[in-house]
From Swiss-Prot:
The lineage of its organism: Bacteria, Bacillati, Bacillota, Bacilli, Bacillales. This is Uroporphyrinogen decarboxylase. Keywords: Cytoplasm, Decarboxylase, Lyase, Porphyrin biosynthesis. One of its GO terms (molecular function) is uroporphyrinogen decarboxylase activity. The record marks D76 as: Transition state stabilizer. It comes from Staphylococcus aureus (strain USA300 / TCH1516). NCBIfam families: hemE. Homodimer.
């Protein structure tokens, strides 16, 4: 086990004193790193995610290179779907493609339940490898939220408008709610296994839920999110982060959920979130596109986010979405260093 562990992010969430604002980046592990690209010359994505030693190496890289205050497990949100009977393929340049999309309640009934130790042992072995031997910061495990997973399963892949997903909600509530309940059960088991293997925080990615209005979120999603988070927390007292894109209209609904940290994209400032009555620890929220700008521009955009975060008192610095491949590793290192220096208590 690691001694003198950097638990800044956990302290921030608990409301304890910290020496600086903690920082990590969504998608910090993977495609923007030259070491990862070199690895991809020899190994496929499947190889990297299914071999614990390789996956642990990729997960650990940003902590070494950028000095982040947390690591996030290098996996795909589709990981728990294949074992339950979803024929999913990750296609380069497209993303997840589902070859057996959900159309009827019979399709939902065909789905099996997940047994993480049997079905995804490589996930748990990666976590154990990181937490038992190497990592000096908390490890974030994660899952896709039921709506976001369902949208892929119904649409058959990425979508811009989620027409088929919404149509199922409106036209066939029995199938919709059966799918939601099944995905909550899967996610609870998957996340619980990650925590029991050594993950110290969980982030739920509800990437596409911003496609829904408030009324539909309350009816079709919120009860299932409450059950998912409550059941996980009922088993383990683990901090839960929730993040989605373009979902600022749902911010008060999210604040009602039993989460610990609310992730903001770049469209809503920390001050605006406070004015809307958000009481959770806030995470975010630099527009990742700014990372392609000159350093003086990046620095000027960082300051108001960090100032508002320090004024709020409960802030984890992150981007408003994931790191993309064109971002230079040196830029991420400088951002992390600037956050640590600028917010030094």
């Amino acid at each position: 086990m690691v001694h003198n562990k950097n638990n800044t992010i956990l302290k921030m969430i608990k409301g304890e004193e910290t020496s600086h604002t903690p920082v990590w980046f969504m998608r910090q592990a993977g495609r923007s790193q030259p070491e990862y690209r070199k690895l991809k010359e020899k190994y496929s994505l499947f190889d990297i995610t299914h071999q614990p030693e390789l996956c642990a190496y990729v997960t650990h890289l940003p902590v070494d290179n950028y000095h982040t205050d947390a690591a996030i497990l290098y996996k795909d949100i589709m990981t728990p779907l294949k074992p339950i009977g979803v024929d999913v393929e990750i296609k380069s340049g497209i993303g997840p493609v589902i070859h057996n999309p959900i159309k009827t309640i019979q399709d939902v009934e065909k789905l099996s339940q997940i047994d993480p130790e049997r079905d995804v042992p490589y996930v748990l072995d990666t976590i154990k490898l990181l937490t038992e031997e190497k990592l000096n910061v908390p490890l974030i495990g994660f899952t896709g939220a039921p709506f976001t997973l369902a949208s892929y399963m119904i649409e058959g892949g990425p979508s811009k408008n989620y027409n088929f997903t919404k149509a199922m909600m409106y036209r066939d509530e029995a199938t919709w709610f059966a799918l939601m309940n099944h995905l909550v059960d899967v996610s609870v088991k998957y996340v619980t296994a990650q925590v029991e293997a050594g993950a110290e925080l969980i982030q739920i990615f509800d990437s596409w839920v911003g496609a829904l209005n408030v009324e539909d979120y309350r009816r079709y999603i919120k009860p299932h999110m409450i059950r998912l988070i409550s059941e996980v927390k009922g088993k383990h007292d683990v901090p839960v982060i929730l993040f989605g894109v373009g979902a600022s209209h749902l911010i008060n609904e999210w604040n009602d959920l039993p989460i610990d940290v609310l992730g903001l994209d770049w469209r809503t400032s920390i001050n605006q979130a406070q004015q809307l009555g958000v009481t959770k620890t806030l995470q975010g929220n630099l527009d990742p596109s700014i990372l392609l700008a000159p350093w003086n521009v990046i620095e000027e955009r960082l300051k108001p986010i960090l100032d508002q975060g320090m004024e709020n008192g409960k802030h984890i610095f992150n981007l408003g979405h994931g790191v993309f491949p064109e971002v230079q590793p040196e830029t991420l290192r400088k951002v992390s260093e600037f956050v640590h220096t600028y917010t030094q208590r």
